[in-house]
Regions:
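Bacterial N-terminal signal peptides
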Residues: 10-18
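Bacterial N-terminal signal peptides that target proteins for export
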Residues: 1-9
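Functional-site microenvironments in short loops/helix caps that host divalent-cation chemistry
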Residues: 60, 64-69, 107, 112-267, ...
Length: 289
């Protein structure tokens, strides 16, 4: 990532560390997915969230050579082959996160410094934000939710394939420049008005049917961040570096401008960061056929 782009990105996402106790979060009991899911139909997760299938096979990962906005950490473009998996159709909402808290006693999604950057009113979640993506969650919060739901965070490669499809494109919807018909972006903080209900942008969905893969909130993925990882990434089912100090954020938040909306954008973040522009979605292995 270029130094200019890196500086802009950090200015967007950096805030005080989110600290606090975490309760044990065991996944709810649930039977195996239906046979329809094994055949490639949409899957409903244990948390009730719809998931879309992403078929096995290769896709081109990383930015094409000569991209006008490409950062160093987005090169080189390389073919990656993934096994079939499922990914949440939508970002995890406040409503679903509330059910997680009720079931586990987990901590609330709150900004560590500025109460004005919260969507929840103390321990209460206003009904008006139930369908908006949860924010003020760090990487460990996201991991705990996905584990509770019987799922996991997507790998960086899984996230990019779900956003990208198998054909060359800059944005989830294709190569048409972003507009407010495609995504929620280029906003300033206005409380709950800043975020849109998940799935609001039909024109912006990905080739596999995932919504908000650009805009609304940045999304945690499983991988540790390494700016040179693409130079040594295995060609099949890459899992990211074995260790690191920062995790990867993908997508783009409500405050970003066009250059960062691209599906190739990689951002590093302290895994303890909680802020008003970061959320997540979950993924799951495909059930055996």
């Amino acid at each position: 990532m270029s130094s200019t782009k890196h500086a802009v990105t950090l200015a967007v996402i950096v805030c005080a560390l989110g600290l606090g106790g975490r309760a044990s979060a065991e996944p709810p009991a649930s039977g195996p997915p239906s046979s329809d899911a094994a055949k490639g139909a949409d899957l409903v997760g244990k948390d009730g969230a719809p998931m879309v299938p992403v078929p096995a096979g290769p896709f081109p990962m990383g930015v094409p050579k000569g991209d006008r906005d490409g950062g160093r950490d987005e090169y080189p473009r390389h073919d990656v082959s993934l096994d079939k998996y499922y990914i949440d159709k939508f970002e995890v909402t406040n409503g679903r996160y509330l059910e997680f808290i009720k079931a586990t006693g987990y901590r609330l999604p709150q900004h560590p410094q500025d109460p004005k950057r919260n969507l929840w009113q103390g321990s209460l979640m206003p009904e008006s934000v139930s369908d908006r993506p949860v924010i003020n969650v760090d990487w460990y919060d996201a991991e705990a939710y996905c584990k509770w739901a019987g799922k996991r965070l997507p790998t960086e490669a899984e996230w990019e394939k779900a956003a990208h499809g198998t054909e060359s494109r800059r944005f989830p919807w294709g190569n048409v420049e972003p507009t407010h018909k495609h995504l929620n972006f280029n906003q300033r903080w206005q409380g709950e008005k800043t975020l849109m209900p998940v799935g609001s942008y039909e024109a912006g969905k990905s080739p596999f049917g995932a919504y908000d893969m650009a805009g609304n909130v940045w999304e945690w993925v499983a991988d540790w961040y390494d700016p040179a990882y693409y130079e040594k990434s295995p060609p099949r089912n890459p899992q990211g570096p074995e260790s690191g100090t920062h995790k990867v954020l993908r997508s783009s938040g409500w405050q970003v401008e066009t250059p960062l909306v691209r599906i190739f954008t990689r951002v590093k973040s302290d895994p303890l960061i909680r802020n008003e522009s970061t959320g997540f979605r979950c993924a799951a292995d495909a059930p055996a056929e």
